[in-house]
């Protein structure tokens, strides 16, 4: 498995990963184009056997002295192999901000557990954040 920078050439693969991982919450096409082209965003893809199996975008917000992990997803059949952890760690290396945040569905216990293992703490809950009205847990890592 390799972690590499992602680009607009990866749009089709990213769309497949996004739809497989997030079903009803998958980002629309224009948002995917934006995340692959927006300046300063850290875009990483996980490749296994020539296939994109995971993606992460990190959004540095230097004026706020923080960064957001905008999205992280690994194809379901490749989960629990350390790919999400590898993407997260590589992105953290590339983001200089002292504070990192992300949000996750409150029902996504495997992801919450991973983030806790990586030093993220729950700092807020956004009520009815997702399309189906499920709340999001906001997690933060200070370094």
Model regions and ranges:
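Structural motif
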Residues: 95, 117-118
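Conserved hydrophobic/aromatic "anchor" residues
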Residues: 22, 55, 78, 114, ...
């Amino acid at each position: 498995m390799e972690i590499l920078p992602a680009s607009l050439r990866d749009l089709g693969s990213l769309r497949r990963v996004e739809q497989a991982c997030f079903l009803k919450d998958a980002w629309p096409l224009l948002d995917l184009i934006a995340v692959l082209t927006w300046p300063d965003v850290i875009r990483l893809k996980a490749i296994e056997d020539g296939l994109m199996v995971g993606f992460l975008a990190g959004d540095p917000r230097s004026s706020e002295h923080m960064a957001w992990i905008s999205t992280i997803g690994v194809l379901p059949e490749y989960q629990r192999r350390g790919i999400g952890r590898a993407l997260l760690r590589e992105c953290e290396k590339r983001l200089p901000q002292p504070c990192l945040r992300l949000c996750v569905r409150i029902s996504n216990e495997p992801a919450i557990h991973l983030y806790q293992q990586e030093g993220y703490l729950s700092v807020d809950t956004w009520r009815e954040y997702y399309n189906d009205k499920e709340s999001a847990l906001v997690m933060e890592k200070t370094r």
